[in-house]
Amino acid sequence: MKKRKIKAIIEKGKDQRFSIYSKDHFGNSYFGGFGASVAAAKEDFLESVKEAIEEERADGNTVFSIDNIVIEYSYDIPSFFNFFDFINVSRFAEYAGVNESKMRAYKSGVSFPGEKTTAKIFRAVRKIGAELTAATLL
């Protein structure tokens, strides 16, 4: 069966909590999630997707099953480092060619990178992903 993709955006709020929202929806049912961590917000978001499926079915509408839904997450920088907390920010800054103290400020959400710096960070994330994908263990 075909998979239904939901694009979700994760951001750290001024209240230091994480929110997830999406422009995608099932009929009149929209999705959202909140939490003290990205992991908690993802759990809440997934629960809202399940509730939307139930509501649509209760209204007699045909919707995808939860097993046929793929959620594609986009992160702001603070959420990225919250979820992937095993990444050392100082080492990542060096790898990406970004000032270490600025990178810590981006991670905490105190300041935000410009377009060029965001592109550098994105390229570094993609490069790490490619290197990990190409790696094998003996």
Predicted regions span which residues?
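DNA-contacting interfaces and partner/effector-binding or oligomerization modules
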Residues: M1-N61
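DNA-binding alpha-helical recognition surfaces that contact promoter or target DNA
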Residues: E43, A105, R123
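Short, charged, surface-exposed hinge/linker loops at domain edges
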Residues: K2-K5, E47-S101, A105-K107, S111-K116, ...
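DNA major-groove recognition helix of helix-turn-helix/homeodomain DNA-binding modules
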Residues: K116-A134
